[in-house]
Amino acid sequence: ASFTADIADERARIAAILDATAPDRLGVRVLIPRLRGLEDSSRHWSVWMTLDHLRIVHEAVGRVMRSLADGVAPGRAASTADVKPSATVDGGVALPYERSCDDILATIAATAATSSRARHAHPWFGPLDVRGWHALVGMHLGIHRRQVEAILART
């Protein structure tokens, strides 16, 4: 429950930031200082790019969690290269990002009671089970919420 609460909290914080920000600032790519947990290759993004990345990650994590809940480790290794955003993404990403948040929460609810011991390796954290991937979602949102704040502090 605390992992899901973390997701809801970070999602709400990102939504509040978006609501309080002029849309023209959200598409500006800004080079930010290195943040803990953020790859150097992710430091020159816009807010829209950050939301696109979160959307891609939520979709990928959802697929991994559903597979693990079925007792099957996904065959393809998780890769940070696979979750890079489009450089040309715009405000049209806002709704797909929100849907991805809804979808990952639905996946979490559907897989929470799994007894599967299947694991899939995260590129940084190693093999994780369903619960480990669940825990990662809120932490990941928090890293990128701080990224959004850093981007907007420089626009």
What does each model-identified segment do?
Residues 1-155:
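Aromatic-glycine hotspot motif
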